[in-house]
Swiss-Prot record:
GO terms for molecular function: folic acid binding; folic acid transmembrane transporter activity; folic acid:proton symporter activity; heme transmembrane transporter activity; methotrexate transmembrane transporter activity. The chain crosses the membrane at residues 26-44, 83-108, 113-135, 141-154, 178-203, 209-227, 267-289, 303-325, 332-351, 356-376, 389-414, 423-441. Disruption phenotype: Deletion mutant mice develop severe macrocytic normochromic anemia and ineffective erythropoiesis. More than 90% of mice die by 10 to 12 weeks of age. Glycans are attached at N58, N68. Keywords: Acetylation, Cell membrane, Cytoplasm, Disulfide bond, Endosome, Folate-binding, Glycoprotein, Membrane, Phosphoprotein, Symport, Transmembrane, Transmembrane helix, Transport. Belongs to the major facilitator superfamily. SLC46A family. Its main location: membrane. The gene is Slc46a1. This is Proton-coupled folate transporter. It holds the Pfam family MFS_1. It is found in: Cell membrane; Apical cell membrane; Basolateral cell membrane; Endosome membrane. The modification N-acetylmethionine is found at M1. It comes from Mus musculus. One of its GO terms (cellular component) is basolateral plasma membrane. Residues 1-25, 109-112, 155-177, 228-266, 326-331, 377-388, 442-459 are cytoplasmic.
């Protein structure tokens, strides 16, 4: 069974509330990412059309006339504004989440995973409410930044992922952990694919508001599930203060205090590897919608939806590929294969000027996401059972920093390179991916069979 009911003595009343059933964590991740992906491309398109209206840009979106718009200065200004406001939203979320995600993740090692899951669910719900107000009332787009910051204050999606991965580590065996991590990431992908397909068609039919209302409804269901249906996986939750430096010190100890079961070098270098992988992933994701909206592709909302769905399919295909490749290859070499396909996909995106070539790039990414579950599993096995929350909150911090770097690098380079090579950020991403490929290979050669921490089998 995935979870266990919280014990008496938990610090908050909802911890002591009886659960309706001992549910797994995967539905929470599915609902959260469905809601986020439903909102993400729509927010980018809303910003694009909002700035187009304000600047008086009326360029046709029909592909047959698209080539004539490539030199339009108004279109370039719309692209630049959209890119910059995407950056502002990500910076706002990072600056708040850097402190809170790490604090809450380490806190969950003592009080249990459920409090963090509930708080993160409420934060995502609050962000959706703010987005609805912006779209319905045509408020200043700066309120998107406010909603993002409020979400980060309660843990954000990174906090939810930290608690979710720690929950999986709590109950998985050493042998099954890599696949369980990949299964959790597959929930992200399936949700993203379905939300992308729905969002593109729905936008064409009914505009921006209704998809945001659906996201709000899903997040309400998610918050209720976290509070009353998720089965706690920490064996003995205990009451503890939230506002104490002890939680942050527990994260620092992971990397600076020697222990028999872990190598500080492996922890640091695997963290660097996942940092680079996440930076490239989210950097490319940040500019892909904008890249597809503008010349020479000029995709409409329907094609944007198909592209976003294709972007999330690797979560599922990577899960299947990981399961098959594990029969004949070590996890390390599965990760290397994933990085190779990721590099190929980035290179194709860089030179894609027609729709079939863009979808070829998406197709080459079918194994691109086997790398992150492998690294997460290796990190999880390097620390003790009581440090999983601290570890994954550290990984959440790495993710937040990577997302900020991704926004800063890709959203700054993209408008700066429009005049000489629009796809240059994708080439940069392909080059950066050689760093984790080298790190993972070197760590395997230096210590091919590290003494990972062995957890007891879950009942």
């Amino acid at each position: 069974m995935e979870g266990r009911v919280s014990s008496v003595g938990s610090p908050h009343s909802f911890l002591n509330a009886p659960v309706l059933f001992r549910g797994p964590v995967e539905p929470l991740v599915f609902l959260a990412n469905f809601a986020l992906v439903l909102q993400g491309p729509l927010t980018t398109q809303y910003l694009w059309h909002r700035f187009s209206t304000e600047l008086g840009y009326n360029g046709t979106r029909h592909r047959e006339n698209c080539g004539n718009q490539s030199a339009d200065p108004l279109m370039k200004e719309v692209e630049t504004l959209t890119s910059h406001w995407t950056l502002y939203m990500n910076v706002g979320g990072f600056l708040v989440g850097l402190f809170w995600s790490t604090l809450l993740g380490a806190w969950s090692d003592r009080v249990g995973r459920r409090p963090l899951l509930v708080l993160a669910s409420l934060g995502l719900l609050l962000q959706a409410v703010v987005s609805i107000f912006v779209v319905q009332l045509e408020l200043h787009v700066g309120f998107f930044v406010l909603g993002r910051a409020l979400c980060a204050l309660l843990g954000d999606f990174n906090g939810l992922l930290a608690a979710s991965f720690a929950s999986v580590a709590d109950v998985s065996s050493n042998h099954s952990r890599t696949f369980r991590m990949a299964l959790l990431e597959a929930c992200i992908g399936v949700a993203g694919t379905l939300a992308s397909l729905l969002g593109g068609h729905w936008l064409r039919a009914q505009g921006y508001a209704n998809p945001f209302w659906l996201a709000l409804a899903l997040l309400i269901v998610m918050a209720l599930y976290a509070a009353f249906c998720f089965g706690e996986t920490v064996k003995e939750p205990k009451s503890t203060r939230l506002f104490t430096l002890r939680h942050h010190r527990s994260i620092a100890r992971l990397y600076v205090v020697p222990a028999p079961e872990k190598s500080r070098m492996h922890l640091a270098l695997y963290s660097l590897a996942i940092f680079v992988v996440v930076t490239v992933h989210f950097g490319a994701q940040d500019i892909l919608t904008l890249y597809e909206l503008s010349a020479p592709l000029c995709w409409d909302s329907k094609l944007i939806g198909y592209g976003s769905a294709a972007q999330h399919l690797p979560y599922l295909t990577s899960l299947l590929g990981l399961r098959l490749l594990q029969f004949c290859l070590a996890d390390t070499w599965v990760a290397e294969i994933g990085l190779a396909f990721n590099i190929l996909g980035m290179v194709v995106f860089a030179f894609a000027t027609i729709t079939p070539l863009m979808f070829t790039g998406y197709g080459l990414l079918f194994l691109s996401l086997v790398t992150t579950p492998v690294i997460r599993a290796k990190l999880s096995k390097l620390v003790s059972e009581s440090e999983q929350g601290a570890l994954f909150s550290a990984v959440a911090c790495v993710n937040s920093l990577a997302m900020l770097m991704a926004s800063g690098i890709f959203n700054s380079i993209y408008p700066a390179t429009l005049n000489f090579m629009k796809g240059f950020p994708f080439l940069l991403g392909a080059g950066l991916l050689f760093i984790p490929a080298i790190l993972i290979g070197v760590l395997e050669k230096v210590n091919p069979h590290p003494e990972f921490q062995q957890f007891p089998q879950s009942p």
